[in-house]
Amino acid sequence: MKPYRLFAFTLGLLLSCSTLASAEILALLNYESKPDQPVRREGIAIMDIDPESGNFGKILMEIPLPPDLVAHHIFFNRDRSKAYITALGKSILHVVNLRTFPYRLQAIDVPDCQMGEDLAVSEDNRTWYLTCMGSNNVIMGDALLDKAIKTVSAEEPSVATIRYPHGIAIHNGIDRVLVTSTVSPDMSDAGESIT
């Protein structure tokens, strides 16, 4: 009889813990108005994507963005406590602290970045790297203070030349940051390198 009680107790404990462990599954999506609308809207929508939720597929809240920002991508830091939003229309990067509700945008000035493309965060969650397509730069930032700390120029005659930086990956194990190139902002010239 004792093995049965132990089994029943263990099963009950597992089932109760799995119920307690369930959590929301949310997604952040950037959106903008269709062209030729009299009022341009841009923002971040937070959507419930848990198929078991009664709110599945519903937008739970919106974070408005400036209408001239042209938000491009959303990137998360390593522990998903912050979301970074790159912009094609301004020399600015936004960050949202996802541990503090209500969510608020914090602007990070990146004056050496003409068009913010991709962002990667170091494995220790202390540094972010932002590729800047229009200005041929990579901006290094302090991920704890959320401010730009250094501009790595990819313009010639620097040792590592890359035109129109786009994709970025970090591998701390080999102490490398890899940056790929793309086309120029006006689509007239193609980059063709990885640095």
Predicted regions and their residues:
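Positively charged n-region of N-terminal signal peptides that target proteins for export
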Residues: 1-6
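Bacterial N-terminal signal peptides
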Residues: 8-18
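Predominantly soluble domains enriched in secretory-pathway, periplasmic, or organellar proteins
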Residues: 17, 21-195
